Curated annotation (Swiss-Prot):
Keywords: Chromatin regulator, Nucleus, Repeat, WD repeat. SUPFAM superfamilies: WD40 repeat-like. GO terms for cellular component: nucleus. InterPro entries: WD40/YVTN_repeat-like_dom_sf, WD40_repeat_dom_sf. Gene3D superfamilies: YVTN repeat-like/Quinoprotein amine dehydrogenase. This is ASTRA-associated protein 1. The gene is ASA1.
Length: 461
């Protein structure tokens, strides 16, 4: 078991402000090599070649707002959410001219390998630092789940098409799950909580969206474009009915049609009352989600879908909220599945097949195996700080009163990839040396950590 912080194998230095998000992308069709996409506190989006460890692309958001979240959508599309309350989607394209740009204050010149076009931009509430969820529902068409524009305890859902700024359509507005959920939890030990709190994290898993809240509650829902609920107004008084009575009965059957409804399919209270800090798809089961909080629990979540995305025949077994936007089975209970890990205050989590990367508030990233044994500890220590234990002795300049204290840089984001082992012999425009380094990189698992001093570390596991 590892007990000490190890010296990182590689350190990427470009950002002058805190690294706020990192995403590793292995898309050899479009990027040719694995890349790392990083964002920082001054609005810089950077794409790195992780084989050469060099910057390939830099995009600076106007007025330098902090970048909150990054998502790679495939096909060289990158979504970026920033503190100027905007979600931007960039379409990258290989720049044959390879424009030269200044990449840092030391006036180093770097080739800009990509050019970009902003293919969509939408205002998003970022007062609570939550991220967003994007789902591709048709070619160049997406569904967005984000915080409500006025209340960060509620969510909005939009649909839009790329390259058509006037295509934005709000499907649902101000959805708050509290009243629906409290009815289900009324007879449980946590039934007295008065609100879910602000949304902390979104995570999409296929057609499901997990929402983690400040209260520690996790809710998973699926989107239903059309929902039919059948009720019968006819009161049967006799078992023998004429043809006319049967006709009247059929006419008295009322079918209510609801559009754009959300069905809650899963609830977890495992972290209550501690806030949800991060969510990650399990690398061992892509239908399972892991969660972290301020405690030492890693929540395990898997929604069980029983009836598919179909209309329900009646509403007897379901609760429909007053807004007619949310539906849930009356028998749905709360899950509390979790595993214990040897750390607390886990601000970031990334699941790997070999274990997990856990980014702690203490400035240390812990890599644990599948038995939750610590494999590696990653961190960056600031220069020693001299501290005087006594004000009187400091006047006397007594060296015995001086002690050395070390402080870690804060961790802002973690990521990781499993060794994939792929055939790279067919890749063009890559030297034998780069092929060898690429093969070595892809055959290993990696832990990537972004720190508040602007550095990004890469360590093999």
């Amino acid at each position: 078991m590892a007990t000490k912080v190890t010296l990182s194998e590689y350190t990427l230095r470009f950002h002058k402000d805190a690294v706020t998000d990192v995403k590793t992308v292995v898309d050899l069709t479009n990027f040719k090599v694995p890349v790392l996409i990083s964002g920082d506190g001054s609005g810089k989006l950077v794409i790195w070649n992780v084989i050469t460890r060099r910057v390939q692309f830099v995009y600076e958001i106007p007025k330098s707002p902090q970048i909150l979240a990054i998502e790679y959508l495939g096909d060289l599309l990158v979504a970026v959410l920033s503190k100027d309350h905007k979600l931007r989607i960039l379409q990258l394209q290989l720049d044959e001219s390879k424009t030269l740009v200044k990449t840092n204050e030391q006036s180093q010149i770097q080739q800009q390998l990509y050019k970009y076009n902003i293919v969509f931009e939408v205002p998003v509430n970022t007062l609570n630092f939550a991220n967003f969820s994007l789902e591709k529902i048709a070619p160049e068409e997406y569904r967005l789940v984000c915080c409500n524009t006025q209340n960060a305890e509620s969510i909005d859902i939009y649909a839009f098409k790329l390259n058509r700024l006037n295509s934005l359509k709000r499907l649902n507005k101000g959805i708050n799950f509290y009243k629906t959920v409290i009815d289900l939890l009324r007879n449980t030990e946590i039934s007295k909580f008065d609100k879910l709190g602000i949304v902390m994290k979104f995570l999409r898993v296929n057609d499901l969206v997990y929402c983690g809240f400040e209260s520690g509650i996790i809710i998973c829902f699926r989107y239903k474009l059309r929902q039919e609920v059948m009720t019968t107004k006819y009161n049967e008084t006799s078992s023998k009915q004429s043809k006319l009575q049967e006709l009247i009965k059929s006419e008295d059957t009322d079918i209510s049609i609801y559009e754009n409804m959300l069905e809650i399919v899963y609830i977890s209270t495992v972290h209550y009352p501690n806030p949800i800090l991060d969510l990650s798809i399990s690398a061992k089961d892509e239908e399972t989600v892991l969660s972290s909080s301020t405690d030492s629990k890693i929540g395990i979540h898997k929604a069980q879908i029983t009836n598919g995305n179909v209309s329900l025949p009646d509403n007897e077994g379901y609760i429909i909220d007053d807004s007619k936007q949310v539906i849930v089975r009356k028998t749905l209970g709360a899950d509390t599945s979790f595993v214990e890990v040897p750390v607390t205050e886990i601000g970031s989590i990334k699941s790997l097949k070999c274990g997990m990367v856990l980014g702690g508030w203490n400035g240390k990233a812990i890599v644990v195996d599948n038995n939750n044994e610590i494999l590696k500890i990653v961190g960056r220590t600031k220069s020693n700080i001299l501290v005087n234990e006594s004000a009187i002795r400091s006047i006397q300049n007594d060296s015995d009163s001086i002690i050395k204290m070390k402080k870690n840089y804060k961790i802002k984001a973690v990521d990781g990839i499993d060794g994939v082992g792929t055939d790279i012999s067919q890749l063009s425009n890559i030297s034998r040396g780069d092929q060898r380094r690429l093969d070595k990189f892809l055959s290993s698992s990696w832990c990537i950590v972004g720190f508040d001093d602007g550095c990004i570390t890469l360590d093999s596991i």
